[in-house]
Amino acid sequence: SAIIPILQGNRDLCINTLNDSQQDIAEHFAGLTDLSPEERFEYHIWHRGQTGQLEVEGALAHLHGSIVDQREIGTHYVFFVQINEIRNTDAQVPALLYFRRQFKSLA
């Protein structure tokens, strides 16, 4: 994936739990669209969390952490992240889930 070098270079990140109306964001970051990694970060409204990492506006939760290890397994990279902050919203909307190659609403 084109995002791998960005993750490896930065090491600090924010994992965003998206709501079911944010499927377009998930598709961009999954590489299902023609946007480059740089364009993916320009496409949506972001704000900086308390640790300085980018958070997706409207996401249900933000998990901030640092990559502590990574493994290449087959055709995938697996990143192990030490989470140091979890913030969630009070939004009462379903979460977005990717399961069996499809996006689903987790209501």
Regions found by a protein language model. Name each.
Residues 1-107:
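Basic, polyanion-binding surface patches
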